[in-house]
A protein has these predicted regions:
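Active-site-proximal loop/hinge segments that shape catalytic or ion-binding/gating pockets
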Residues: 2-71, 78-224
Length: 224
């Protein structure tokens, strides 16, 4: 495993995060996946999990360039993307890993103004360093549908496009996980008692989730 190093402009990146009141990065996943994350002691890319034959529900795209990144969002999850996966997997329970913002300061971290699997990203590429981070908050950014214009009332800690991502080279250690958010108290009990996640790390935050997950019932559902 490579020793973690920091970007040459790590200080500038941290200053930008602080000035924008960005307190966390987010990564949504299923209860089954988060159990594997805690067993392995880190988050790994889809490529590595497939090579190790670790059972997982994959949300991150399989990158054709061979790069091993973990897809993260800034300050809150991508509601649209989480809703899509939740619709496609109606019996899966979802949680959100809230990660330390300092991950953005690491060497090799890249920033993209749109979802990493989108054609616009392949066309316009990604960027590293404070330049790449600032680009996420531009007045107008390229996106799948053309361009996304920043709304006047957009909170300063949210990127112009909700599809923006932070691509972090694997692994992300458990020490960078601040907490694990779930949609309600019952979900917390299941994640702690059935999946073995430490209770002190699991927090309830209904507003962190899209509306379709706030009202979903898992009573009688078949889960792993």
């Amino acid at each position: 495993m490579n020793t973690m190093t920091y970007s040459v402009d790590a200080t500038a990146i941290l200053n930008e995060l602080v000035q924008r009141s960005i307190t966390q990065l987010c990564h949504f996943t299923t209860f089954g996946n988060v159990r594997s994350i805690f067993k392995m002691g880190a988050l790994y890319s889809r490529q590595t999990l497939e090579e190790l034959r670790v059972p997982a529900d994959f949300q991150d795209p399989l990158r054709c360039d061979g790069a091993r990144y973990i897809n993260l969002s800034i300050h809150e999850v991508n509601f649209r993307l989480l809703s899509k996966f939740a619709y496609d997997q109606p019996y899966a329970e979802w949680c959100i890993l809230r990660l330390r913002k300092e991950i953005c300061m690491r060497t090799g971290v890249r920033f993209t103004t749109d979802n990493a699997a989108a054609g616009q990203v392949r066309q316009y590429g990604t960027a590293e360093g404070v330049f790449g981070l600032k680009a996420l908050f531009a007045a107008s950014v390229p996106a799948k549908a053309g361009c996304v214009t920043r709304k006047a009332n957009k909170p300063m800690n949210l990127p112009t496009s909700p599809q923006a991502e932070v691509l972090c080279p694997e692994p992300i250690a458990l020490r960078d996980v601040m907490d694990v958010m779930v949609v309600n108290w019952e979900a917390k009990q299941r994640l702690v008692n059935k999946y073995g996640i430490p209770e002190a790390l699991v927090k309830v935050g209904e507003r962190c989730f899209p509306s379709m997950l706030r009202c979903r019932s898992y009573e009688g559902a078949v889960m792993d």
